[in-house]
Amino acid sequence: MAQVVGKLREEATPGEHLVLDRLRTNLPKDMTVYVETPISLYRKISNPDFIILTNYGYIILEVKDWRNFKANKHNALVQSTKGEIRHANPVTQARDYALDLSNAIRKTAEKIKVPCPKVPYGFAVVFPFVPAYHKKTLQDVWGETSVLFEDDLSSHMVNHSIKNTIREDMISPITKKTMELVRGTIYPETVTSDGVLLDEEQSKLVLETSVEEVAKPAEQPLPKAPKPTPQALFAEEVKPEPWNDLPLEGEKIISGNSVRLVRGVMGSGKTLVLLGKAKHWSKMFPDWKILVLAFNKEIAQLLKKELRGNPTIRTTHLDQLLREIITTENKYLWIYPLDARSWVRNHEDQYEIIQNLGCDFVADELSWIQEVMVSSREEYLAVKRVGRGNRIQISRKQRDEIYDLLEEHYREMEKKRQISWELLYLKFLEWVDSGELNPPKFDAILIDEAQDFAPSWIAVVNKLLKPGGNLFMVDDPTQSIFRYFTWRQRGVEVVGRTRYLKLPYRNTREIYTAAQAIIKDDPQLISQLESEGEEFLSGEDLTSMRSGEKPLLIVAKQQGSDVDFIEAQVQHLKRKQGINYENMCVILPVHREVARFEKSLSKYGVKVITSNRVKGLTFDVVFFCGLETFFVNGNPDDAAYSSNQKRIIYSCMGRAKQFLYLMHQNKISSYFEGLREHVDLYEL
């Protein structure tokens, strides 16, 4: 459901009421419809019926209730009770309004002394009551994309219809600052400097104001800011708790720190909130050193782009930061860390425990031991092992053998002067505690995709925080594609400090519902959430989401036919939908397949990426290939494995904003039976 600004005048026509209703209901939430908003340009005032602001430009719509009329390139003769009345070509009128707004945007940019960007625009006239058999004739006279009819405003057509009014060579995404400039031209008081567009709930999370912040006069130069207490930062919503009432695990991180967790469903704007919070703190406390941490380098690059121009904010991913700290301190010559999974596979023939439990199971167990910072064999034998489900249990003897493997792994690495990713975090903590490393300290650290940060990672983050520093995190447990840890396991007390974003806006309703079908009944996920006193967030009001086409589940009978299909489809989508190639993506489950797809698709600029690297990225079109490879390598009794596979699939499906293609070789696996009612099937 689109945001609507303004209202129709009392004497508005039935057609104008009908069009507004269709736009409000069928356009997505991230579009804004301005109703009868005057455009002021020098001494001229234009009054278009509707202005639609999107993330790829603006569209002017004029509405005509005409039913019987004749048209040529310049005029229309409209039948009325008073006879024929001549009207100027309304398409020309809509075009003039679009040009007026373009010039007004340039004038606004000059006034506030910023460069004037190119803003794509379109225009059209809507004829809600023209009989269907007249459509072709009218389109021939005034242009196919310049005239719209009632069916063009239906839920499955409206996005394509309005986008099609913009010339294909003009279409390109516009920045948030540009959108703010356009908003500020229409309503001058809405011009802002940071360019972040948030809905009401997101804005509350970003702009929660501390006691110290209220006291600062905005027009005065900002003095060196005193560090706010944890209680002050969240005084509006959280009653201060005595720190000695916190459990021991919470005190490890919480003591002296303000902790904030924003938990949201897929596509609810969690990252927008994080970006807004980082900019807000940077602006209010200019002497703070702020660190924004991403899960991987792809997300870090996107966040860095959004936060450029903020010199007090450092944006990176944790692996890169540790590498810089360690090599700067000359701890040792950097050797790219080993993958424990590869080490286990290389030793499968030597150890019966690997053969019995499987490589993936044993590798996950070795990682878990290190990530929860188990420090001895005795502790591992005694610790309660959670996260594996009830159908598979590890005996004490098997634990003993697994710990033997871990010690052998350590011995081999020490002999070869190597290190694993898991051990790197433990060594970092050891070196900091011993004084061998002196890492930089930050006043505030913000973590995106925090659900994938293991306890050892969070312990490292704590070492990077100044005493009394502030920790702000956003997460979604349903997208935890590695191991799941509760925040209590990670030493972070978030009870009473968690806020929720329940409204998804990124995907179409059809894509979101299909993705939800994969995980909504996952017993492992439900159990894990219940252990935190949480429940599964399924999205609040899906009726407000924009509608689109169902995902297409393609069953390929021949090996290799997937590449040919995708190449033909990306050309079709570019030609018919106007979607740029860089807004399309192919997701693969394994890296060895990347080269085969890139050979055919690299010339278009279509991104080809693996499922473990696509987290946090979004595209208009996603081709998710290789579904048949899921659920085949692990132990079917391993609840953690099955849940992990479902979350990977769910997260990858959620990367698609408009069109989603799911590709499966041969017969559809039983794991995907629940998808059938949410997709259209196609045999290739």
Predicted regions and their residues:
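Intrinsically disordered, low-complexity Ser/Thr/Pro/Gly-rich regulatory segments
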Residues: M1-P48, I52-S203, E208, E212-K216
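Phosphate/oxyanion-binding active-site loops and adjacent basic polyanion-contact surfaces
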Residues: E11-E16, N89-Y97, L198-E201, K270, ...
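A general secondary-structure junction signal
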Residues: T37, D65, V125-F129, H317-D319, ...
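Conserved P-loop NTPase-based nucleic-acid remodeling module centered on helicase motor cores
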Residues: N55, V63-A98, K118, K136-V147, ...
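Coupling/switch/interface segments within P-loop NTPase motor domains and analogous charged loops
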Residues: G122, F129, W334-S420
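Pre-Walker A segment
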Residues: S155-M266, L272-M284
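Conserved helicase motor core of SF1/SF2 NTP-dependent helicases
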Residues: P223-K224, P228-D245, E251-K252, R260-Y336, ...
